[in-house]
Curated annotation (Swiss-Prot):
Pfam families registered for this protein in UniProt: HHH_5, RuvA_C, RuvA_N
Region spans: Domain II: 65-137
Lineage: Bacteria, Pseudomonadati, Pseudomonadota, Betaproteobacteria, Burkholderiales
GO biological process entries: DNA recombination; DNA repair
Cellular localization per UniProt: Cytoplasm
UniProt KW keywords: Cytoplasm, DNA damage, DNA recombination, DNA repair, DNA-binding
Region (Domain III): 142-190
Gene3D superfamilies (UniProt xref): 5' to 3' exonuclease, C-terminal subdomain, DNA helicase RuvA subunit, C-terminal domain, Nucleic acid-binding proteins
This protein's GO CC annotations: cytoplasm; Holliday junction helicase complex; Holliday junction resolvase complex
Presence of the UniProt keyword Metal-binding in the record: no
Record-linked NCBIfam families: ruvA
Function: The RuvA-RuvB-RuvC complex processes Holliday junction (HJ) DNA during genetic recombination and DNA repair, while the RuvA-RuvB complex plays an important role in the rescue of blocked DNA replication forks via replication fork reversal (RFR). RuvA specifically binds to HJ cruciform DNA, conferring on it an open structure. The RuvB hexamer acts as an ATP-dependent pump, pulling dsDNA into and through the RuvAB complex. HJ branch migration allows RuvC to scan DNA until it finds its consensus sequence, where it cleaves and resolves the cruciform DNA.
Name of the protein: Holliday junction branch migration complex subunit RuvA
Length: 190
């Protein structure tokens, strides 16, 4: 498998870019977010890649970060989501925004992506739940390490993500971990 490509960017033709590596030009499908982040043609670039070999084609998908590639790989495992739809999702939402949408179960945010209907969005939320948040830490309250620790403790105690997030919202700013867990449990028991 081709995991990463470094070379000279010779062409941008959305959603495909062409990267020259020692005289060989690789056509790589990229999400629009990656395309916009790339420098002008002629510059040296590195893309994290995912290779798909089918009977009739070999397709190379490229991403600006390994987190974006990992998210793509998780997305294509979801029933009804192919590589093109996964690229559309990553074009419309950053990895952090997708993780937040999954954590907060926001079907409306996902249905704004072309190719994602209500049922597909619900399936995506169901199958992706718990697969991104821990890796990326993109929950709305993850800015503080303490809140992340409190959230993980509540989840480990068996509370749902929704309940845990609601309890976190009620905590005062700057609370330490042990006090935060105590206050969150108190809020959850009510």
């Amino acid at each position: 498998m081709i995991g990463r490509i470094t070379g000279t960017l010779i062409e941008k033709s959305p959603p495909v870019v062409c990267v020259d590596v020692n005289g060989v030009g690789y056509e790589i499908d990229v999400p629009m977010s990656t395309l916009y982040a790339l420098p002008e043609t002629g510059a040296r670039v590195t893309l994290f890649t995912h290779l798909v070999v089918r009977e009739d084609a070999q397709l190379l998908y490229g991403f600006g970060s390994s987190a974006e590639r990992s998210t793509f790989r998780e997305l294509i495992k979801v029933t009804g989501i192919g590589a093109r739809t996964a690229l559309a999702v990553l074009s419309g939402l950053s990895v952090a925004e997708l993780s937040q949408a999954i954590t907060l179960q926001e079907t409306g945010r996902l249905t704004r992506v072309p190719g994602i209907g209500k049922k597909t969005a619900e399936r995506l939320l169901l199958e992706m739940r718990g697969k991104l948040g821990a890796d990326i830490g993109a929950t709305p309250h993850a800015a503080s390490g303490h809140q992340s620790d409190i959230l993980n403790a509540l989840l480990a105690l068996g509370y749902s993500d929704k309940e845990s997030q609601a309890a976190l919202k009620k905590l005062p700013d700057g609370v330490d971990v042990s006090e935060g867990i105590r206050l969150a449990l108190k809020a959850l028991v009510r």
